[in-house]
Design a protein with these regions (language model features):
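N-terminal cap/lid segment of alpha/beta-hydrolase-fold proteins
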Residues: 35-81
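Mobile cap/lid helix-loop segments that gate and shape the active-site cleft of serine hydrolases
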Residues: 48, 205, 209-242
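Short beta-strand element of the alpha/beta-hydrolase
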Residues: 82-93, 97
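Catalytic nucleophile-loop/oxyanion-hole region of alpha/beta-hydrolase
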Residues: 99-104, 108, 120-158, 295-302
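Primarily recognizes the serine-hydrolase "nucleophile elbow" in alpha/beta-hydrolase
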Residues: 145-214
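Short beta-strand/loop motif that positions the catalytic acidic residue
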Residues: 246, 251-254, 258
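Conserved alpha/beta-hydrolase "acid-adjacent" motif
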Residues: 259-268
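C-terminal catalytic histidine-bearing segment of alpha/beta-hydrolase fold enzymes
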Residues: 267-316
Length: 316
């Protein structure tokens, strides 16, 4: 009798958990459908239209040679539990862009905030006339270190920190997450803090710099990446060269028709990761370009659902 009672309680609990997860999915789907009249316009929104209700804007997290670096922090103040942290790292080819969260993923950010996440949209020093991968990676790692330093002030759950970034932001995020705590040290005041994260969402990031189609990217990238230097850059700053055991869980999303970052490089990254028993997941898009042009409504929903399911499952 007691065994049956215990089994019944377990079944009820499982049912409740599934119900909660499904309610989150439906809420997310509703938010996505509100995004615009057509999800096919997602590519044009990917670098514009900031989301509303910023909780803390322009927090200075470090100084680089006199230049202040800032991020925006979004928090649902009504939730008092320790907050999982998701850090958004923008793309734009390392040479331009800012921390404004694009409208295309604002529904994801709004949902996560509503579910109790602390969302950070960080910035990093942009390349001008020289390659500064070291600084950019240290900026991402220093954002993570800042979270550890301020965990009590903002009630962060530092056991549940994730990174999400498109393109160049994904490359910087992967190296920041795959490298050790004592690598890519920037601000000395943050040096003593860890840079460990639990998971990463890699949105079509270049995992092997030697295979990027530079001619299809911004002219500033071509100017910075000379033929003489590309080999050394590739060895030092390609995420594929940081693959080892016990890496953070990683969701890789890439299109077969990416015209700048070859799809096969993400396949290679995925295979290298799972070969060493890392938890790497892969979601393939069929027809869109690197800038998500030609992304169908169906694929957009699949893209969003995979991201949100992955983040929620990692943050239990």
């Amino acid at each position: 009798m007691r065994k049956k009672r215990t089994l019944f309680i377990i079944i009820i609990l499982i049912t409740l958990i599934i119900g909660v997860l499904n309610s989150i999915r439906f809420k997310f789907l509703y938010e996505v459908l509100k995004l615009s009249n057509s999800l096919a316009t997602i590519s044009s929104d990917f670098y514009s239209e900031p989301i509303k209700d910023i909780t803390y804007k322009d927090i200075i997290y470090k100084r680089n040679d006199g230049e202040t670096l800032k991020f925006d922090l979004y928090i649902n103040g009504e939730i008092k539990d320790p907050k999982p942290v998701i850090i958004y790292v923008f793309g734009n080819g390392w040479v331009y862009g800012d921390k404004v969260i694009p409208e295309a993923i604002s529904s994801i950010i709004d949902l996560l905030k509503d579910e109790g996440f602390a969302v950070i949209s960080t910035s990093y020093e942009l390349m001008d006339d020289e390659v500064i991968f070291d600084k950019q990676i240290s900026d991402v790692k220093d954002t993570i270190r800042w979270v550890y330093k301020n965990k009590d002030k903002y009630n962060f759950d530092v056991d549940n920190i994730g990174l999400i970034g498109p393109s160049a932001g994904a490359q910087l995020s992967m190296i920041a997450a795959f490298s050790d705590d004592d690598e890519f040290v920037g601000d000395v005041s943050l040096k003593e803090y860890p840079s460990k994260v639990k998971y990463i969402v890699d949105l079509f990031g270049p995992s092997d710099l030697s295979k990027i189609n530079l001619s299809a990217g911004p002219s500033e990238i071509v100017d910075n990446f000379t033929a003489e230097d590309i080999e050394s850059y590739s060895k030092l700053y390609s995420p594929i060269n940081y693959i080892k055991e016990d890496l953070p869980d990683t969701l890789i999303i890439h299109s077969k028709k990416d015209n700048i970052v070859p799809y096969d490089t993400s396949v290679e990254l995925y295979e290298s990761g799972i070969e060493l028993n890392n938890k790497f997941d892969f979601y393939t898009l069929e027809n869109c370009t690197h800038y998500l042009e030609n992304l169908s409504n169906k694929e957009a929903l699949g893209l969003y659902m995979n991201i949100i399911d992955f983040i929620l499952s990692e943050s239990k």
